[in-house]
């Protein structure tokens, strides 16, 4: 299966493909390849290159350098900041960051009553429900003027995977994902 996937990626890379919005047009992440029990680096790298070639706007910068706030503005983004092990695992990091130096914003995508998201929203300086559309979500995150954007997970679902291609803060990083 892995050899077929890698061969298919090489064939597709030679085609002249164009995507306007990979979240809508592809709508899937590559999370399940982590179960192949092999090194995913080259496959991930080739897939990312394919997406960037087919949709150059994915990698655009949507932020400027430091906005000049007195506190460092840190954002955490994940669809999993709800009753999920990812949300439970990283809630404490958001909750206990020193507020005298750091302004914390949490981003997720689903509205609705969720006790964990409600707790996270109370424990951070700002909580934002992002629209389930790639372009609008990018703009909304960039508009907050973050210094650092932290993805708690990348690849578990397609929207955060495709969001992670864009520069939405001067510093971007990812945590361990699914504990």
Label every model-predicted segment:
Residues 1-179:
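Alpha-helical solenoid repeat scaffolds of the TPR/TPR-like class and their adjacent stem/linker regions
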């Amino acid at each position: 299966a892995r050899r077929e996937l890698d061969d298919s990626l090489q064939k597709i890379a030679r085609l002249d493909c164009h995507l306007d919005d990979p979240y809508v047009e592809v709508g899937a992440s590559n999370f399940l390849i982590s179960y192949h029990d092999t090194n995913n680096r080259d496959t991930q790298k080739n897939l990312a290159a394919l997406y960037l070639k087919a949709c150059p706007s994915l990698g655009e910068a949507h932020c400027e350098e430091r906005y000049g706030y007195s506190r460092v503005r840190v954002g955490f983004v994940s669809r999993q900041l709800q009753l999920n092990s990812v949300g439970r695992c990283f809630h404490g990091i958001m909750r206990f960051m020193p507020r005298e130096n750091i302004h914390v914003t949490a981003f997720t995508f689903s509205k609705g009553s969720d006790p964990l998201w409600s707790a996270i929203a109370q424990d951070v300086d700002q909580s934002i429900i992002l629209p389930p559309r790639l372009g609008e979500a990018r703009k909304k995150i960039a508009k907050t003027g973050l210094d650092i954007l932290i993805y708690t997970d990348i690849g578990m679902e397609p929207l955060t995977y495709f969001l992670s291609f864009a520069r939405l803060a001067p510093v971007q990083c990812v945590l361990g994902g699914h504990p």
